[in-house]
């Protein structure tokens, strides 16, 4: 479905009492599908303009739109979202990342500057919101929705509020150890020929998908090489997080399942049933969960509301999915994640979370 989005925002004083408005039309511009307005307290014109864009994009996504034409009278927002101008102000950068994350969900989207005379509907909504902001000392007035669709901060059927931090969870490509189905934890094998082909295909898919604000990776070579390949396709740098490393399998490193079971039959059996059990000289799955949660929390704080590519290993990715599902340890033994597969988990500032995708491999 194709839609037209009109958005506007402003402040009285710049900065001053601010608000935004957004409206989503059918492609022929004949019918209003959704509209939003909100007073946002004291802010600048540019912040309010971005907030209006985010509201319009969010409404369009929730309507199921796949294509969008965005019309705004803010030259700055149009040029920045089109990639022709750089975003330098830190307050705008955060909003830009949120807007790009929403825009990435459309198959096709374009931005057009229009004079204010062609943006009167959204301008009226924004002025209504600014009136409300001027009448209230509250910095965050409640959003006023006019039709039965949701604003960016209204609760959906999950009860979550706001824009989530979306984690695209990419498992590294194949290595010689993974090809032989051997335990591969803190050992540092590189990608093999198949692995390099896999990560190239994944990187191409992610570049076409777009909307990714950052790449965070395990420091182990197989994951880091996967991350660098994707980051180059996305024109981004790689940030390394040690808490994303694979489980330390200790003495079982490099062994097959059968070899580890033969070496320590009773311990191996218990390890498969109890996440507190530690392999000889290694770490338990409970230990992995604790550090992965710590790493996840850093990502959420550092990239709040953005889409982040997280490149890691099978166990840390399972742990992130477990956290998003708020599930028990049993889910670890029931999830299958292929090499170079993609999963998606979302985490909201209010503590809500969801899993959007598990083990996508169609691009390979």
From Swiss-Prot:
Mg(2+) 1 binds at residues 8, 49, 73. Gene3D superfamilies: Phosphoglycerate mutase-like (3.40.50.1240), Ribonuclease H-like superfamily/Ribonuclease H (3.30.420.10). Its EC number is 3.1.26.4, 3.1.3.73. PROSITE patterns: RNASE_H_1. It holds the Pfam family RVT_3. The keyword Nuclease applies. One of its GO terms (molecular function) is RNA-DNA hybrid ribonuclease activity. It is an enzyme of class 3 (hydrolase). Mg(2+) 2 binds at residues 8, 123. SUPFAM superfamilies: Phosphoglycerate mutase-like (SSF53254), Ribonuclease H-like (SSF53098). Its cofactor is Mg(2+). Optimum pH is 4 for phosphatase activity using p-nitrophenol phosphate as a substrate. Is composed of two domains, the N-terminal domain displays RNase activity and the C-terminal domain has both acid phosphatase and CobC activity, together with a role in enhancing the RNase H and dsRNase activities of the N-terminal domain. The N-terminal domain alone is monomeric in solution but associates in the crystal to form a dimer. Endonuclease that displays both RNase H activity with a hybrid RNA/DNA substrate as well as double-stranded RNase activity. As the only authenticated RNase HI in M.tuberculosis, probably plays an important role in the physiology of this organism, being likely involved in bacterial replication. Catalyzes the hydrolysis of the phospho group from alpha-ribazole 5'-phosphate to form alpha-ribazole. May also catalyze the conversion of adenosylcobalamin 5'-phosphate to adenosylcobalamin (vitamin B12). Has a possible role in B12 recycling, but the primary role of the C-terminal domain of this phosphatase enzyme could be phosphate generation to help bacterial survival within the macrophage, which is a phosphate-deprived environment. This is Bifunctional protein Rv2228c. It comes from Mycobacterium tuberculosis (strain ATCC 25618 / H37Rv).
